Amino acid sequence: MQRSNTSEFSKFRVAVLGYKGIGKHHIQVLKKLGVNICGILTSSETSGSFATNEIQKEFGIHTKAYTSLDNLIFNSKPQAIHICTPNEVHFSNILKAFDKNIPVFCEKPLLWNESITKKEIDKKLLAISNHPNRRIFLNTSNSSIISQIKNYLINIKNVKSFEFEFDTNGKYKFNNIAYDLFPHGLAMLQEIAGTSTRFNDFAEYVEEHKYVCTFKYKTIDVSFKFCQHKNLQKRMEFCINNNRYQRLQNIKNQDCLVSVKDFKAKKIFEIKNPLESFIIEFLRFC
């Protein structure tokens, strides 16, 4: 991917919906890229005041908080919107942005709540797909980990097995752990083997803080293992044809530095922050 500079996006106006959690990481990357963060959406005036004060203190950014997306769009006139809100309101925010012809960068899952049915999912996906102003990126940025290290991977064109392990200090339990973390492994798997709509021989094992599944993806034997608990340290490892790798992250001067450790070769490869790579691609798409 071609590298960017801060002047490339300096006149581009982006609004971020949701600040806590992943929203803060989006602001960190957008600030590094020189983007004009023209507004944020929060759930209340109190949380908005807290967010704008913290953003000013940590990133030196002066922005305005809104509690209404309509007001945010009308007043701040964003050229793109990053959706980092709770899953339950993704769909309504996406359509509202599309109605104003604003492209969307949406956090995963695209749409989800515990009571949603397959029929409702299909209906909402169809509404997104058929919208005349549909321009949307889903944050499956971990695919870029594979794309950036492909030249170092052994037998990448003849993958027989793929294992993915992800531990986080997230809040989800039981099957909801998979709804949160499954897209990370799937994005990497699709980067390796291309897309497929079928999983064969699917089996799963679920505990309160653990989710494990195995399945066949095309000709690849796949295993996913996820753990979530407030006391866990974040850890991501993956194994391709029994060769194990680990994603390493370090924050330095408000910049997320990412590398991949190859256990067999005893080497560490520096890569671009996957979220930054995906956001750059999205901004150029806009």
Regions found by a protein language model. Give the residues of each.
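N-terminal Rossmann-like dinucleotide-binding module
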Residues: 1-59, 283
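C-terminal helix-rich "cap/oligomerization" subdomain common to oxidoreductases
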Residues: 1-9, 16, 80-83, 135, ...
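Beta-loop-alpha module in the N-terminal Rossmann-like domain of NAD(P)-dependent dehydrogenases
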Residues: 16, 61-105, 109-125
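Receiver (REC) domain switch-region micro-motif
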Residues: 40, 81, 162
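A contiguous active-site-proximal alpha/beta segment in oxidoreductase catalytic domains
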Residues: 88, 111-170
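Rossmann-like dinucleotide-binding domain that binds NAD(P)(H)
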Residues: 167-233
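NAD(P)-dinucleotide binding in Rossmann-like oxidoreductases
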Residues: 204-208, 217-280
